């Protein structure tokens, strides 16, 4: 993983040369991150950093999306502060994935809000103040419950290390209380209905890099927190509350998919589709099967490629040319923008889970695990595949089919920069769809280790009946 940070340092150095007067402290901070995976024994402050298969993949995805998010908006953003905020946000996410204790996880979980808040407040659309307030109030308030749960761990164990807390045997009542506190922050970050209302507003007003990183990486912190904070330690409570969470997930998938059919803003449509796909991830994560957990992580990776690509097209390429995001403004793009139309159709088919894409692998495994856990709710969740095909095909047919509307003027097709950006997102999605074992082998450590923890805790409870 040291090579990962070498690449990150090189990227920061390159950006400092391309962007005039880029602050050189960014290169220093990024270089210091190279040694962080080895600093696992800071006993004086109880902070631990390392990585495993799941963290490695999410960190690589973060590293992959950072330069794309900056280059996608290269022509519009001349401010040095804009690129510094994007790099700071990326560094916060990288450190968050390396944290091995709850305290440092919460610190960087909250610290990632600061650059995102500034990005939206300074470079967002007309209602950027409202969007910045939404993301701050929703996520900050919900995370306070997580902080209270972590404080209780500190009182009981005098330690918040993942390995130590995963071996702690708690009563069911205490587990349920901790589960409700932890899941409050995770449900807002995912987000699940009815706590999802902040995400469409934030996406519609956020700058392009903010939307790409929010959809591609920041939402993945919820799944990452679930597998780090809840499942190893609160396994009994997670089994107890799984039906309730499944009902929330199914309600989220149905509601967001149906309401997407009535939306006209292109960024809001993609934002609602992100909510639906993250609900599928939560279904697989709580399935208590290795199939579902693996599928949930694979779908997170797939969503990290496809959703930023769609945001790049509607919030970058089309908006730069027409300064409009209304769906009914566009029609017949395939007649004079064939390359952009082909790229959009490929990403749309991937987003609806078409076979031979990595999205199909993730959704199939997640729904398989959900059906094994709860057949009725899992079958209802499988209807989301049909609903996602409905709104995605409606959007694709409207933008690419027919003849152009009288409001549109003929513009140029994709530039070389935009073509390279699209290829860098489409090729991994299709390649991993043909060879999913490449990413599943990386991710195998996480569900396998989690399954071992669950078996071990079950054995302990059977051996000590009074616990």
Swiss-Prot record:
Superkingdom of the organism of origin: Eukaryota
GO molecular function, one term: ubiquinone binding
Membrane spanning stretches: 21-40, 54-74, 79-99, 105-125, 135-155, 168-188, 207-227, 239-259, 266-286, 297-317, 330-350, 367-387, 420-440
Enzyme class, broadest EC rank: translocase
Any one annotated GO CC term: mitochondrial membrane
One BP annotation, GO: electron transport coupled proton transport
The enzyme's E.C. designation: 7.1.1.2
Family: Belongs to the complex I subunit 4 family.
Function of the protein: Core subunit of the mitochondrial membrane respiratory chain NADH dehydrogenase (Complex I) that is believed to belong to the minimal assembly required for catalysis. Complex I functions in the transfer of electrons from NADH to the respiratory chain. The immediate electron acceptor for the enzyme is believed to be ubiquinone.
Record's protein name: NADH-ubiquinone oxidoreductase chain 4
Chain's gene name: ND4
